[in-house]
């Protein structure tokens, strides 16, 4: 595997020179953050990002993410225009030497948590998800503002989007995902980009919205939509691991054995009840995911792709983007490296 780290560009408090100092760190996972969703990413912006990263002795290994416009997910007549823009962005990325793109198909909201600064017993702060809190929350109230959410919506436009989704069933969303995949994958194949869909986080419906990339059966169905080795998965242990029915090592061996895992997020979570969890340190005993068994599965399939530590706790007084501080993710990266060295020896 190739160890990577998420970086949110020049405004990120976690500097590239700090990331470079993490033992074994090779690559960066990033994106262009100042182009509106649905717009074409200019080649010069991609090159500027890549060159900045390379000046620090790292490589731009994965784009996470190129967002999918809501009109595509809703199946609106305007989707074709946004799909053409998406294709052009893929062409620009390939021309800049990028070969892996992570994306998701979660309606309206990206990853969702009920609290960003829950204090754990050791004094660190973590992201948590409590189903009873979310079920009582009105997404229009402004009570929850999460880093994973698209804050470009004004309250009225968000209300309109949520209203539109009341007419969209899971099967409708599958139809729209199929349309999107079958439209973009010929271009991805043409330019040599591996597309890696990220599972829904958490892997169940929230606020009455359909979510369809949640388990092994869903991923099988996804891969059946288009026959290409470039059509694949971001295997996220934190997202899929929130549901204890998901056997992560088995899924890694199954999909990785097909060569369909193009990118991996390795993190731990502690399940605290039905549809509830806390994000924990990466250490196996800190949560519900057997990290050693998971990394061994990656080793056994000969995984050589990019893998990154995912959300970390806030520790040692660090302040910054929830889940994306330096210290705990650096500890996580070193822990993952240690497991990899052990299973490889």
Curated annotation (Swiss-Prot):
Q: Which GO terms describe its biological process?
A: D-glucuronate catabolic process
InterPro entries reported for this sequence: Man_deHydtase (IPR004628), Xyl_isomerase-like_sf (IPR036237)
Q: Which UniProt keywords apply?
A: Iron, Lyase, Manganese
Record-listed E.C. numbers? 4.2.1.8
What's its catalytic activity? D-mannonate = 2-dehydro-3-deoxy-D-gluconate + H2O
Q: Which cofactor does this sequence's record say it needs?
A: Fe(2+); Mn(2+)
Protein's name in the database: Mannonate dehydratase 2
Q: Which organism is it from?
A: Halalkalibacterium halodurans (strain ATCC BAA-125 / DSM 18197 / FERM 7344 / JCM 9153 / C-125)
Gene symbol? Answer: uxuA2
